[in-house]
């Protein structure tokens, strides 16, 4: 089936407009889509395809056909990306613009519908003072009244979904293409704005995952044409800007997990970048990290992020002040901003918990490998060399003089908690500060962690002073302002969590309301040292003010204190102890002075040896690295070649599958078209899809031909019946017409005569009037003739010369034209003659070539016929030779049979005593049987069976077989059915005579054996068709094959007289029939 003719884009566009004009927009969209996706459109100029594509985008948006638009846009991108990128940007921008316009229109329509509903509800209120009852609320729920959400779902949501699909389609089309990268980034920004404007959290997650996959596949397809290069600084900068926008939107939508993944993406891109990022971007990065860590309650890294943010602000302020950088590339660093950042750095550092208060992790969670990996990841995200701690953050803050820049209440809070902590007055001092912090919305989030830190400090200090303390006393000490009041349950929960983690060792007696601190001097001292299960503990000897030593510390340091006291006593009591120390010191100095030079030389020699070994090691390492690099290059080259080979094979396999699929589609389309033709008409065949799968095109064509034949026969039958009916009708009409022909003829004559008379009168009357008018006109004109003749003569006289001149010019022009025509005619005749001669020559050459080809073909045909004749003659000779061999074999068999027959007759005529009886196995049916005597002279089975049948005496059974007479055969001999002439062996061949009179070789030999002349031979069976069947009586055998007395043959055998020529079986059968 040939493909449909390809139309020009202009014609397709015109046809689409015509379809739109008759309200056939879906058909127009299908037409445009088929034209764009056609393979022939690849060679069409882009300027002609662009209007078609714009109209297709408009129609697809109007009809919400996103899939058709997607297919067409993919095809258009493949066509135009190598020639004109601007047209792709134009079409894609048009697509998104139209989709966004539809969403805006849907929102306006929803607002109008909602406003009309609200206006209707407001005007239909009967009683303004009546309140809503439960019945009215239920009725409003189940009634048709629409709420705002329902209206949006019905009107706005479908278009929002279509716009989201449009963004995703455009991003997928533009991905990993360096020439379309700007449009890709701008589309991603528009998609982020769409998610933020309409609060589409699910779509935002999918969008982030889509962009992440695009970046991951960029390295995979880096070898393709126009692939993006992430090593390009401009490309990487654009991707960073997109990821920062993604981070901002994630934070605005409060999708903290997605925000954290966006931070990881940004960090990965920053590591790839060779160009340092702008300070304003990094400031945004750290600011978003602070919000993410705060939501995740990771106060340690939250404080570290604030510290990095403050450092970046200070650096930006210095860069701007020195004029080394642009102000637009740096974040604003005014004194107010620096003060706010410093306050948050101190406040977040103070909020880091001293101990862990979570309940989900065990005491050893700090040492878990997963936790270490997580801290390592977070440290890398903050671009820090090592994991931060509470003490390190405070030390860094003091080095930057943050106390001087922070707000006063934050500074006082630091002094109360870290410098001058007193458990009995802590709450009174800190309450006004917490009230100020709680008044600020940004700092209000730190009140709860600050309470945890204060409670930790409180219990640490109380454990150093008291062994037992009343719970009410602890509650009185932990008094906070009213919005942040701590209850007893909160205190108990804090104690239980601290005990569970091993950071506190406190027992609670609810009966007496007393808290008991662990006073066992041999217990662990973990409670006395500030620790944190989150990795945020202070360093050993932290900033917590120690009031006194605990008993456990006293016991643990007892030996150290004893050693120091003994040393001091010996120093002051025993002077010799000091003198021995001085002598030992002087001796050591003398030894060092004496061996200083030698040791110096040894050190220098050792240094030279070390340097030499370093050089050798470096040379060996360089050589090893060179070999490894060479091996690596070879391995990479092999992998690259293997990958290229694999890709080539995959391409070939895809091409083969594509061709097979196309062939299957073509065959399927041909079959469907044929089936469609079969289903048209009154005699349509009902062929289902299952039958279609089992039929090929040849079978379908055969079915179609049969159907056409049936239709043709039906039409011919109908025509025959119709013609017969028309003949009968025409015959009936004519019979009826004959009766009325005479009357009709008379009436027709009368009508014709009346019409003739009427026309004649009118013609005479008109002619008479016309004659009178002509005569009158002649009389009028005759009066003017003298004046006309005079005017004509004068005019001819005046213009005679001009007339002659024009006449001569006309004659010359006529002669010139005649000469030109004669010349053209001669040239034409000459050309025709040459053309005719050329045609004759070509025809002559063609005839000669045809004659040569015909002669060559005739010669080849004759050679082929000769070859066939030789092959036929050879086959005939082989066949004749085979026939002669078969005849010879048959004659030999007949001779053997005759010879056996004569021997059998001789043996039968001999007396029984002189010779042994003839065994059944020596008959004409096969080779002679062996006469094997039984052991001890006993008769054989063959000898015993005949004697038992005739009732022989026991004495006769012991006789030898040679002494017994042959049994008499009284039954009728059985006729052989598998042979025509003899009892055993293959059937005898029916050999026909050549002349019908000459005897065969077998007959001649038989005549010689009987002693008679050959002329007395009887006629053969073959002369009369087929001879009589041979019976067992003729062979001397009985029904069971044993030897019996020979019976006379029913018919005498006659010689056939044939020369022994072989006759095939089919000829014998035809001759017999």
From Swiss-Prot:
The UniProt record lists the keyword Protein biosynthesis: yes
Its principal location? cytoplasm
**Annotated GO CC locations:** cytoplasmic stress granule; eukaryotic 43S preinitiation complex; eukaryotic 48S preinitiation complex; eukaryotic translation initiation factor 3 complex, eIF3e; eukaryotic translation initiation factor 3 complex, eIF3m; multi-eIF complex
SMART domains registered for this protein in UniProt? PINT
The PCI domain extends over 338-522
Q: Localized where?
A: Cytoplasm
Q: Which residues form a coiled coil?
A: 596-737, 790-910
Q: Keywords on this record?
A: Coiled coil, Cytoplasm, Initiation factor, Protein biosynthesis, RNA-binding
Q: Which GO terms describe its biological process?
A: formation of cytoplasmic translation initiation complex; translation reinitiation
- By its UniProt entry, which Pfam families does this protein fall under? eIF3a_PCI_TPR-like, PCI
Output this protein's name.
Answer: Eukaryotic translation initiation factor 3 subunit A
Provenance organism: Pyricularia oryzae (strain 70-15 / ATCC MYA-4617 / FGSC 8958)
